[in-house]
Structures are given as structure tokens and as C-alpha cells.
Amino acid sequence: MSKALPLLTRQGERIAITHGLRTPFARQATAFHGIPALELGRMVVSELLARSEISPDVIEQLVFGQVVQMPEAPNIAREIVLASALSVHTDAWSVSRACATSFQAVANVAESLMIGHIQAGIAGGADSSSVLPIGVSKKLARLLVDASKTRSLAQKLKLFSGLRPRDLLPVAPAVAEYSTGLRMGDSAEQMAKNHGITREQQDALALRSHQRAAHAWQQGLLNDEVMTACVPPWEQPFEQDNNVRAESKMQDYARLRPAFDRRHGTVTAANSTPLTDGAAAVILMTASRARELGIAPLGFLRSYAFSAIDVRQDMLLGPSYASPLALDRAGITLADLSLIDMHEAFAAQTLANLKMFADERFAREVLDRPRALGEVDMERFNVLGGSIAYGHPFAATGARMITQTLNELRRRGGGLGLVTACAAGGLGAAMVLEVDS
């Protein structure tokens, strides 16, 4: 175990997370159809400020992320500042770390707090899979640039005369890794085969995720951390995630065909997280600033870590690499955790990471650690369900997980929680959260 690295300001104060909020998450082309990520982000930041009753002038920085970026608003963070009640003098910039984007946003605000540049900031992310930057072919794009340099209609017509009908077809955003051409689901299939994870195991985890998420909603556990959204055509408010299947059964999952490896695969639409729209954000500040404002924090950021691995083999094992680092930096072990929340991009990916947490050979030969983290107690794991049930607006998921875990720790009387995620490009993220008893 490496030496613990406490996250403290120069004055020795802890980094407090005082508030967290998200929109309900909506499956692609449903409740948020036509609502861009920028509007979702503005919506959640505005409501977060209103609920916190913190003066907008207190917030000195906004770090916000978006994975599927819109060309017309490349700095979503600054646009949210300008569209919300935040002061126009609020510093703002955008980040992208694929599915770990809001983890990165939280880390950036925490770093600003630690070095003393600010005393309070907001971190979060938003994504829309319903409002996408549909592009044009490379040939047409090049001709459009060339045409802008011509002077006469004849010159323009000559340029476009070489176009073919296929050159005019719209081009959707890529769903594959740029470096390998593999889709996320292809990597999940690879991991299922490499780690001996069966279709039944994947379906069982997916069913568990939906059952626990449905129970969380039924018990009102999420009411205070999910806002009601009112969007066009203003017919009715949108109050709960619409992907959670409360009545599903194992036989329902067994009926679906593989989505990626059609002949021999085990990854289906049901044991994967769906394309989703939504936004989430948290407020961070120094412990002293929270005291000055009379705010009791939800909890504290104890440590964080990021990792990067080869994209060609087990690309989604990021949690198995980042989590040991985060635990080391927090000065704790797996046994010290009250809760573990892992992003469920796919059931296969989640189960593979759980295996690697307990794999002694992986620890010694791959991580160069003397021992594995250990077996995960499933009674502490994704206790309210995970991304398979809630959905996954890429840049918003981390902030959802952080808020959800802090609130659950508070319900349990305090403790330590690990939140961790894989991300495209072979990236991983992990954070240790702390709630005082």
C-alpha cells in the first residue's frame, strides 16, 4: 500500500460536498427528446442553487462536462453560467473524460479548493443522446470549405458536380473507439469471454439493478436528490427515471438476443445501460466556508484516482486499476468501506471488475500489489441499483453516483464509500467519500 494522501486545503481543511442534485434520467427520444444537454445542465444548476439557498455570488467556479459535444456550444460550462443565476464573473470551463467526466469535474473543483483559488464551486455534467451533432461526409465537408473560397456560381457548381448521393447522407456521431474501431459492447463481450461470465450471471445482475432502483424510488429514497423537470410541450412534469423496470423477471431478460456478437454473444440490450438524457451536479466548498454559511455538508471527498489501460484488451477494467489507488490514498482498505457504487456500463464489465477485485494473480502480476483488494460484500454493493437501471447520460453519471452514495451513507449513520467507473479509452476513475458519524 502506498502512502495516504489526504485531500486538504493549505489550511488543513477537508473538501466538503454540501449539496447534490440531478434531473430524472430519460431513455433516448422520450421525456427529454429535443432538449439539448446545455438546457439540461442549466436546469439542474439553477435548481441546485435554488434548493441550496446559497447566494450565486458564493459560487466562484463551475466545471461542467459533456461527452457528446455540440459544435455551437463547445464550452457548455460557460454557457450554463450565462444562462443561469450564477454571476457572469463566475469562472467556468468544460471537461471530458468519457463516462468519468463528472468525476473529473469534481476533481478539478477540489484541486481549486485545495490550492486556495476558490472557496466554493459547482461540478457536474450533462448529456443528451436525443439531440446529437449529426454531421456530413468528409467529402462534402471538404467541398463546403472549398466552396466558401470561390467567387462565382460556376466555380461552386464545378466543385459539387463530383458529389455522389452517398456523399449527401448524414453522419451520426461515432459509437466506436477511434483507436480500435471497437464498440463499447464489443469490449464488454470480450470481457465476458475472457473472465468466464455467463449470460445468466449478467441477466441476474441487471435484474438486481432494476429491482433495487425500483425499491429506492418506491421508498422515496431518491426524492430529495432528483428534481422535477418541466420541459416542452409542458403537458406534464417529469419526476422519475423512466428506464427503471419495476416488474421485470428473469425470463424477460432471457428472451432478448445478443446485441453485439449476434451468434455467440451474451451482452444484450437488457444487461447493458441504455442511451440516456440527463444532468447532475454537486456543490463543493471548504469546510470553513460551509461553517460560515451554516451548512451541514452531505459528506467529504477523502481521495480520488484515475487510471489508464490498453484499449485492446479488457478496456473496461478501469475500476480495478483506479480503486486500489483511491483506497491507498485514503489510507483504507476494502474492508473499511460501508458502501461501494460501481458504474454499470454493462453487467459483463461490472462482474469482470468484481472478479478482479478479488483476484490475487491479477493483483500481483498486473497491478504489482502484494494482495488483492478482496471479495466485495454484495450487501454493500450498488445497494440502490446502478446505471443499468437508472440509465447513463455519460457526463452526468459520476455526479449521480456521488450524491446517491453520500445520501445513503447518511441514512446509515455515516461511514466510507467508494464510487468508481470505467470509461472509454481504457480510462478509470474512483473516489472515496466520507460521511461523519
From Swiss-Prot:
Database matches in InterPro entries: Ac-CoA_C-AcTrfase_FadI, Thiolase, Thiolase-like, Thiolase_acyl_enz_int_AS, Thiolase_AS, Thiolase_C, Thiolase_CS, Thiolase_N
Pathway(s) per entry: Lipid metabolism; fatty acid beta-oxidation
Chemical reaction(s) catalysed: an acyl-CoA + acetyl-CoA = a 3-oxoacyl-CoA + CoA
Active site residues of this protein: 99 (acyl-thioester intermediate), 392 (proton acceptor), 422 (proton acceptor)
Any Pfam family: Thiolase_N
Residues of the signal peptide: none
GO biological process terms on file: fatty acid beta-oxidation
Keyword field: Acyltransferase, Cytoplasm, Fatty acid metabolism, Lipid degradation, Lipid metabolism, Transferase
Any one Gene Ontology cellular component term annotated for this protein: cytosol
Any GO molecular function: acetyl-CoA C-acyltransferase activity
Highest taxon, organism lineage: Bacteria
Localization, UniProt: Cytoplasm
EC number: 2.3.1.16
Subunit structure: Heterotetramer of two alpha chains (FadJ) and two beta chains (FadI).
Function comment: Catalyzes the final step of fatty acid oxidation in which acetyl-CoA is released and the CoA ester of a fatty acid two carbons shorter is formed.
PANTHER family: ACETYL-COA ACETYLTRANSFERASE, CYTOSOLIC, ACETYL-COA C-ACYLTRANSFERASE
Family: Belongs to the thiolase-like superfamily. Thiolase family.
Protein name per Swiss-Prot or TrEMBL: 3-ketoacyl-CoA thiolase
Phylogenetic placement of the source organism: Bacteria, Pseudomonadati, Pseudomonadota, Gammaproteobacteria, Enterobacterales
